[in-house]
Amino acid sequence: RLMPSEKWNLSVFGKHYNSYSEGTVQLSDNNVGSDTRVSQSVSSFGYGAAGTYFLGKAIQLKLSYEKALRMPSTQELFGDGDLEAGKADLKPERSDNVNLSASYNKQLGKHGLYVEGGVIYRNTQDYIKRDLSTVGGTSYGSYTNHGRVETKGFNVSLRYSYSNWFNMGGTFNNLDTRDKEKKRAASSGQNALTYGQRIPNIPYQYANVDMNFYWHNLFAKGNTLTFGWDCFYQHDFPLYWENFGDPSTKIRVPQQISHNLSLGYSIRNGRYNISFECRNLTDEKLYDNFSLQKAGRAFYGKFRVYFGK
C-alpha cells in the first residue's frame, strides 16, 4: 500500500484461487435422475489495484480495477437434489471489473448528510448463467457457461441524520447485464439471436429505504426505545430471453414491494433487550429463489440477555 500524503493512497493486491469440489450430482438423459459422484479442482491467479483521493475533508473519490475469478458455488456444481440440477464441469467466471465512485460526507451541527454515487463496468468470460427447464412436467434450474457478458450499471446512496435520535436513507441500483457473445458456437459460425439482449432471470433494478427513531433514557437512564421502518423495491424482470415470443404472453417475475416494521427496547445500556418485528406488513406476494415463495405477513418477538461485563 502506498500513502504519499493524507489526500490520496494506492493499494495493489494479488489473489490466488484454489478450489476442490467433490459431491453427488444427478446425471441422466434429461439432467434429472441417478446420482453420480464427481469432483473438480480449479487453480488460478487474480490481481487488482484501488486508489482513493480526497477533495478537501468532505469529498472522496475512489477508483478500482480487478482481474477477478468467481468460483462456481456448491449448488451450481452439484444441485440440491430437488429443484436445482448441478453441472459438475462448470468453469469459473473470469472478469475485468472497474468501479468509480464519489462520496460526500458533511456534519453541520446536529445535521449529518452522506451522499454516494458510483458507476460499474464488468466484462465477464464464461459467465455462469442460470436457466429454467421443464422435463416430464417437472421444472428445475440448471447452469451453463455462457461465453461473454457485459455489465454496466450505477448506484446511488443517500443518508441523513439528526442528532442521535433520527436517521433515514436509501439506495438505488441499476445493473444492465447483456449478452455479448456474437456467435452461437465458435465452430458453427452462426450468429447468436440473443446477442445484445438482457440476460434473463436476473433482477436489474432495485432499491431500499429505511427510517429509524431513537428515544434515549426513556423511563430510566440507560434505557433506549427504537422504532424502525424499511421498504424494499424490485422491478419486474423477464424469466426468459425478452425478445423471443409474443410480448403479451411472456412470463415475467413480477414487481415486488415489501414493508417491515420493528420496535425494540433496551434496558441498562443493552444488558436486556426486547424486540418485536412485523415483516411484509402489507402481505405482498414475494419471491426468493425459483419455485420458492417467501412468507406473507409475519410477526416475530425476541428477548436477549447479555451476561458480559
Language-model features, listed with the residues they occupy:
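Membrane-embedded beta-barrel scaffold of Gram-negative outer-membrane proteins
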Residues: T52-G56, Q60-E66, P92-K152, N173
